[in-house]
Design a protein with these regions (language model features):
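Sec/Tat signal peptide C-region and signal peptidase I cleavage site
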Residues: 20-24
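Bacterial N-terminal signal peptides that target proteins for export
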Residues: 1-10
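ATP-dependent phospho-/nucleotidyl transfer catalytic cores
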Residues: 521
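Accessory carbohydrate-recognition regions in carbohydrate-active enzymes
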Residues: 25-443, 449-516, 529-550, 556, ...
Length: 796
């Protein structure tokens, strides 16, 4: 597909707009056909391979087991090395940590009689089945597996509904378990009812408990999922169970599993039903879901998958939906594996957040009341892993689909309005989980508006965020949930306002890390203030963004200064650069670099550009000069986790952009691949995959809340990004595994020697032509005045 675009003269910092046009080459292969959903299903990626749509409410995917009934094989429900499947659940989250989440209402075909309760099948020895990857197929919007019990399973999805086929073998019982209580981390209530006359099963499960085992206050339920399942074959029998009791001919069941330690439900608890069919039956089932009501689940199903729909038809619709979404970026060149890795990363980006409103516009709010989307929205969204996705995910989503970005922003504002004015940092369905640190909703909204998402109540959201950043609440002063799930939106805000840093003893998950996160949040808030015309607020929050300097100890080590914990009295506790004391999922050596909006200021505190370069070189390399990109110890980068993802781009500020090109390509080539272990750690609802997409395009949104793009080098010879403001054409005809260094760049036909692009590229589009070579041109982009901008504290 090609579209006209407006070209912008970037060479003069886009001061003059030039009219123009270009036509993108059609992609040689269907983007959806190149997706490999099994990427990330091992190595801690925690992705799932099942059927879903872009941002879909339903994700129908297998639940694997490693022989423990109350534990999923991996968060996300699927582990490539786990040899058994115990069900196919209707909901999943991709790339999470902890013990998992969602995994609601598993359906499981079994070819034996149901003689004991599935809830006491402690080792998944009776009602699970082995499978082999040779009998498995996954594609965008479709999943199929032939189980060792002889049943062939096919799954496909619409936005709020899905369809499955269970082809049972001849000569064996044909039973289908509906394990309604068995969400991945348990449930507090479950109900299910069989109507044999209409061949329908309906029910609901009440769950939540994401990372609840880390804080007792969060071991709770906060959503209910309703489902309606309509079958095309008559039921020959039915039954139910509750805990250890089995009821032959039962048509109802009630009872959740409850919650237990370590994030998993207790053994021996739960409820569900089963239905039987004639031996050898080919059974089709259409399922609608809703987080509001059974009536809405039924309406969602009827609207999306009418009774005459076939599974091949739904599979094709899902394929087309993914093609349309993925085709927002067209690439040409590279290897087949590189193209598959790229489009699978973009696929993972578009899995979350998720549509949470029904076809009638209703959704369950954080106050557990039913609400309706407002006039600006097309949908309400849920599942916001803020600490992760504010870094580069929401920028990409919004640039490609500005209405989705706008709806996410409005959804977050609605959540805050329904949550006593608090913007939670990690939301799951209709609940606040408080997981991680900082105040990521602020940069999230600033990211969205910077990349083209404008259809939300910016004035109202800004006022709400300012209040949260300036008025200390009881939750901000509470230790509930700490360390990992501190309940305050701005933990220890009183210290921030009084000390101008978060102290070593606080109501936060690490004073130093919280200080850096709050500094980024306040910088983003200054950007929102600029957008709404609040000059005083812009100056106030830009000044506060500079508070990170109060935790820089120039005498931390004989080798140089570090950002570290600081006591409330101003003294410095004992310190070593490998410590994680005061930080979140990273060491002081990693967090030293996390000042993305004021990199020049950081370099100055380190003693100047040359000293910063020396420390960056040591950060990315072992003593022998080899790369240290992950698992090299706490003194080095961890490019498998968020605190390090911006660091390879810092060489652009240091006058050595060729080192950014080199480091980013090393990560792309060695840590990412077209294989189950092809994501280096938790994908975190698509955040890490978004980093890969940006890096493969040769650019990155370093500064929270702004649309400047730092430059690396393109992986592909040709790419077209159909962005919110216009098409961006990226040509690098010499791109190859060897030719990774930028020797020259033209923008809209004019020579360009800066290793970054101003916001006008995102806002209006443009044409980039890279000259790449196997050897670096160490002069290109190296001049001091060519470096990307920094934003120091405001001074009158």
């Amino acid at each position: 597909m090609s579209r006209p675009f407006q070209s912008v003269a970037l060479a003069a910092l886009f001061a003059t707009l030039l009219a123009g046009g270009a036509t993108a080459q059609d992609a040689p292969l269907s983007p959806a056909s190149t997706v490999n959903p099994l990427i990330g299903s091992s190595n801690g990626g925690n992705t799932f391979p099942g059927a879903t749509l872009p941002f879909g409410m339903l994700q129908w995917s297998p639940e694997n087991t490693r022989g423990k009934h109350n534990r999923t094989a991996a968060p996300g429900g699927y582990l490539y090395s786990a040899p058994r499947i115990r069900g196919f659940s209707l909901t999943h989250l991709s790339g999470t940590g902890c013990a998992g989440a969602s995994g609601d209402v598993p359906f499981m075909p079994v070819t034996t009689a149901i003689t004991t309760s599935p809830s006491i099948d402690d080792h998944d020895s009776h009602y699970a089945s082995d499978f082999h990857h040779a009998d498995e197929h996954a594609e965008a919007g479709y999943y199929q597996v032939k189980l060792d019990n002889g049943t062939n399973v096919e799954l496909s999805a619409a936005m709020h509904s899905g369809m499955a086929s269970f082809d049972f073998p001849d000569g064996k019982p044909a039973n289908l378990l509906i394990r309604v209580s068995d969400s991945e981390v348990g449930s507090s209530a479950a109900d299910v009812r069989i109507d044999r006359a209409t061949r329908t099963v309906t029910g609901a499960v009440t769950s939540g408990n994401f990372c609840g085992y880390l804080a007792k206050a969060d071991q709770r339920s906060y959503y209910a999922l309703y489902f309606v399942a309509e079958f095309d074959q008559p039921f020959t029998q039915s039954g139910s169970w509750h805990d250890a009791s089995v009821h032959s001919d039962g048509t109802t069941a009630h009872g959740g599993t409850s919650y237990a330690d370590k994030g998993f439900p207790p053994l021996g608890k739960g409820s569900g039903t089963w239905i039987g069919f004639a031996s050898g039956s080919s059974v089709k089932v259409r399922v609608g879901i809703s987080y509001v009501s059974l009536a809405n689940a039924r309406a969602n199903l009827q609207a999306e998958i009418p009774i005459a729909t076939t599974l091949p038809q739904l599979r094709q619709r899902a394929h087309d939906a993914w093609n349309s979404a993925l085709d927002r970026i067209v690439i040409d060149g590279g290897s087949a594996d590189q193209r598959s890795t790229f489009y699978t990363a973009l696929y993972h980006v578009m899995m979350h957040p998720n549509v949470y409103s029904d076809v009638n516009g209703e959704y369950r709010g954080f106050d557990q009341q039913t609400h309706r989307i407002d006039d600006k929205q097309q949908a309400q969204y849920a599942n916001f892993s803020g600490w992760d996705i504010y870094r580069s995910h929401l920028q990409l989503v919004t640039w490609l689909q500005p209405q989705v970005g706008s709806d996410i922003a409005q959804s977050l504002y609605h959540q805050a309005q329904q949550n006593h004015g608090e913007w939670d940092r990690w939301t799951h369905n209709s609940g606040a989980t408080h997981v991680m640190s900082g105040d990521p909703a602020v940069p999230a909204l600033a990211d969205i508006i910077a990349f083209g998402g404008r259809a939300f109540d910016l004035q109202g959201a800004y006022a709400s965020l300012v209040k949260a950043a300036t008025i200390t609440t009881a939750n901000d002063l509470s230790d509930d949930g700490c360390n990992t799930e501190c309940v305050g939106q701005r933990p220890s805000l009183d210290q921030w306002l009084r000390l101008h840093y978060i102290a070593s003893k606080s109501h936060a998950w690490g004073g130093a890390g919280e200080t850096l996160e709050d500094a980024s949040a306040d910088f983003a808030l200054s950007e929102l203030a600029r957008r709404v015309g609040d000059n005083e607020g812009q100056q106030q929050f830009l000044t506060r963004a500079g508070y990170w300097r109060n935790l820089f100890n120039p005498n931390a080590t004989p080798q140089g200064g570090y950002i570290q914990n600081r006591n409330a009295d101003g003294s410095w506790p004992a310190f070593t650069p490998d410590t994680d004391e005061g930080f979140v999922e990273g060491s002081a050596s990693i967090y030293l670099w996390m000042v993305p909006f004021d990199v020049h200021g950081l370099f100055d505190t380190l003693g100047g550009r040359d000293k910063a370069i020396a420390r960056l070189d040591a950060f990315f390399h072992q003593a022998d000069g080899s790369w240290a990109l992950t698992n090299a110890g706490p003194l080095h980068a961890e490019l498998n986790n968020e605190p390090s993802v911006a660091t390879p781009w810092l060489f652009d500020y240091a006058g050595q952009p060729w080192k950014t090109q080199q480091a980013v390509r090393a990560v792309v080539d060695t840590l990412w691949k077209n294989a189950p272990d092809g994501i280096p750690g938790n994908d975190d609802l698509g955040e890490m995959s978004s980093w890969y997409v940006w890096s493969a395009l040769g650019m990155y949104p370093e500064i929270p809340g702004r649309a400047e793009l730092l430059l690396g080098s393109p992986l592909f010879a040709h790419a077209v990004v159909h962005g919110a403001g216009g098409d961006v054409v990226i040509d690098a005809p010499a791109a190859s595994s060897a030719a990774l260094y930028v020797n020259a760049l033209s923008v809209d036909g004019k020579t360009y020697d800066r290793p970054w692009l101003p916001p006008q590229l995102v806002e209006h589009g443009g044409q980039l032509h890279f000259t790449l070579a196997a050897k670096p041109d160490k002069q290109w982009g190296s001049a001091d005045d060519n470096a990307p901008p920094s934003f120091p504290p405001w001074h009158p």
